[in-house]
UniProtKB/Swiss-Prot annotation:
It comes from Candida glabrata (strain ATCC 2001 / BCRC 20586 / JCM 3761 / NBRC 0622 / NRRL Y-65 / CBS 138) (Yeast). SUPFAM superfamilies: GatB/YqeY motif. Residues 1-17 form a transit peptide. This is Altered inheritance of mitochondria protein 41, mitochondrial. The keyword Transit peptide applies. It is found in: Mitochondrion. GO terms for molecular function: carbon-nitrogen ligase activity, with glutamine as amido-N-donor. Keywords: Mitochondrion, Transit peptide. GO terms for cellular component: mitochondrion. Its main location: mitochondrion. The gene is AIM41. Belongs to the AIM41 family.
């Protein structure tokens, strides 16, 4: 009888490329979920479960794991708030005030975690984008939006402005229309 000898390659440990803030927020969410379960706070429990499932789905969908940072959390949280605001409008239109109130309370829970993230606010982004675009307008007054996006160093901007590339893009587009069209 022959024995097969398998060489067992040491399992490579999955390296997490997440920022420490990302991991801290997830840890806080899990701790708060346990606390909500022990205090039987159903609303907070479902809101935190929803947040954690959204984060997990984003982790699964992410092609580049290094993009899982506080900025991706900020984008996910703001998307969740926008979805709930849309739901509230629908519930009010259909005279379901009880469900609208539930979603308002979930927004409060999500906003609690959103405010804890060290990310620039929308007003800060708007002022930084305005300043940035005015500087570009002085050097190149006939700049087009496509040319602008080609000139932007996105890695430097996300670090300097403390915001995700997605939120910077949307802010620059909205401010570009105001500055370069006038």
């Amino acid at each position: 009888m022959l024995r097969y000898s398998y060489t067992i390659a040491p399992r490579l440990r999955l390296v997490r490329y997440n920022s420490t803030i990302y991991n801290n927020v997830i840890g806080t969410l899990k701790k708060d979920l346990k606390e909500a379960m022990s205090t039987k706070d159903a609303l907070k429990k479902t809101a935190i479960k929803s947040i954690l499932s959204t984060i997990k789905n984003n982790e699964i969908d992410a092609k580049d794991k290094s993009l899982l940072d506080e900025y991706s959390l900020h984008d996910a949280f703001t998307k969740m708030v926008a979805q709930r605001n849309d739901s509230i409008k629908e519930f009010i239109a259909n005279k379901r005030d009880d469900l609208a109130e539930k979603d308002k309370q979930e927004i409060e829970v999500i906003n609690k975690y959103l405010k804890e993230l060290p990310v620039s606010s929308a007003e800060d982004l708007k002022t930084k984008a305005t300043e940035y675009l005015k500087q570009l307008q002085e050097s190149e007054p006939n700049l087009q939006l496509k040319q602008l996006f080609g000139k932007v160093d996105w890695d430097a901007l996300t670090k300097d402005w403390k915001a995700s590339q997605k939120s910077i893009r949307t802010t620059i587009v909205s401010e570009f229309k105001n500055i370069f069209k006038s």
